[in-house]
Amino acid sequence: MSRRNVAKKREVSADRKYNSKIVAKFINHVMKKGKRALAEKIVYGAMEKAEKQLGVPAMDVLTGVLANISPAVELRSFRAGGVNYRIPVPIKEERSRFIAFGWLLSEARKRKGMCSRDRIALELLEAHSGHGGAFRKFEENVKVAESGRAFSHFRFFNTGGARRSNPSNNIGGNR
């Protein structure tokens, strides 16, 4: 077991335009190879485009999208009796937001023939209205969680692996 200290969570500073930590987290999620200025340009452009099309403030668009596609449970795999079960486990709001951003960006990146700003804006619009790729992933997550609810009692068991006895205690060669 490691003797090091547990890494402390660092606070994300709010973004410049909307003064929101949620937007700052979204920018960090979009950012690749440390190019923050480019990520900010993409996110702000996408939010402005969504704001123009919906006629709703950009922050309300983003919070509406997160309300529509943030999962309440995460599916964790558990092996019991030679069968893998996907068990729904409740998650914190921060983890839920992280998963929602991942779904949103993965579905936006699947769209071809547009710039990143337009792809993200289109995905934001669709997720806000309750359809689109990210919303489909959310619904699929809910369905699988419903079907795995019967096995949710497994989450209280130790999932750290099988218990093994100390081999030096096995006198006589019993394994």
Curated annotation (Swiss-Prot):
Taxonomic source organism: Neorickettsia sennetsu (strain ATCC VR-367 / Miyayama)
Gene3D superfamilies: Ribosomal protein S7 domain (1.10.455.10)
Pfam families: Ribosomal_S7 (PF00177)
PROSITE patterns: RIBOSOMAL_S7
Lineage: Bacteria, Pseudomonadati, Pseudomonadota, Alphaproteobacteria, Rickettsiales
Keyword Phosphoprotein set for record: no
Source organism superkingdom: Bacteria
GO cellular component terms attached to this protein's record: small ribosomal subunit
Subunit structure: Part of the 30S ribosomal subunit. Contacts proteins S9 and S11.
Gene: rpsG
Function: One of the primary rRNA binding proteins, it binds directly to 16S rRNA where it nucleates assembly of the head domain of the 30S subunit. Is located at the subunit interface close to the decoding center, probably blocks exit of the E-site tRNA.
Entry's Gene Ontology BP terms: translation
Keyword list, A-Z: Ribonucleoprotein, Ribosomal protein, RNA-binding, rRNA-binding, tRNA-binding
SUPFAM superfamilies cross-referenced by the UniProt entry: Ribosomal protein S7 (SSF47973)
HAMAP family (UniProt xref): Ribosomal_uS7_B (MF_00480_B)
Name of protein: Small ribosomal subunit protein uS7
